[in-house]
């Protein structure tokens, strides 16, 4: 079956599991033309079965591999990358790399650790209101990003309590979801 696939490309390889590794190995067996893109420092899906050893053992599993490290970051400021490098250096098993940028140093990151999701929601709204007062922003100038839709409830509850209009892009507001309305 691998005859059908002259080239195999896998994105987010750090998030692959054992079954996907086996499939990738079988599909690329005939021609050996395999390209993967991934970052061992972004492997966060072990709870879903992802196996970080897939990317860490890539050179061993696919002999003749050439690793190209993309260490220059075009989006973040220097201070954001300094914080990222400080966290990444604690990874015990990894490919060695040092992220860098030609961008400005930028502001220092602000870290808030709330006791729960409602503390986080309150903090977000407090910061929005502070910036509106001090910097004269409008509500429409703000965007709140979250990783999972389940995180929206606490933020939405606080926004509703404070009578702040908002919209959800790419989904439904928590209280408009079918399973909540029923």
Q: What function would you assign to each model-found segment?
A:
Residues 181-182:
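Conserved RecA-like P-loop NTPase helicase motor core
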Residues 44-46, 165-168:
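Short beta-strand->loop structural element characteristic of the AMP-binding/adenylate-forming
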């Amino acid at each position: 079956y691998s005859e059908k696939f002259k080239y195999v490309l896998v994105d987010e390889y750090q998030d692959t599991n054992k079954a996907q590794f086996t499939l990738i190995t079988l599909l690329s067996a005939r021609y050996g033309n395999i390209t993967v893109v991934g970052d061992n420092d972004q492997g966060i899906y072990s709870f879903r079965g992802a196996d970080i050893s897939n990317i860490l053992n890539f050179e061993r599993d696919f002999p003749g591999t050439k690793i190209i490290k993309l260490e220059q970051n075009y989006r973040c400021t220097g201070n954001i990358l300094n914080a990222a490098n400080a966290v990444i250096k604690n990874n015990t098993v990894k490919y060695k790399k040092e992220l860098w940028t030609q961008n400005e140093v930028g502001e220092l990151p602000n870290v808030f650790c709330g006791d729960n999701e409602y503390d986080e929601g309150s903090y977000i709204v407090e910061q929005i209101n502070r910036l509106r007062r001090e910097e004269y922003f409008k509500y429409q100038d703000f965007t709140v990003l979250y990783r999972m839709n389940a995180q929206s409830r606490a933020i939405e509850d606080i926004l509703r309590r404070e009578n702040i209009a908002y919209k959800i892009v790419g989904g439904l507001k928590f209280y408009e979801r079918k399973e909540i309305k029923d």
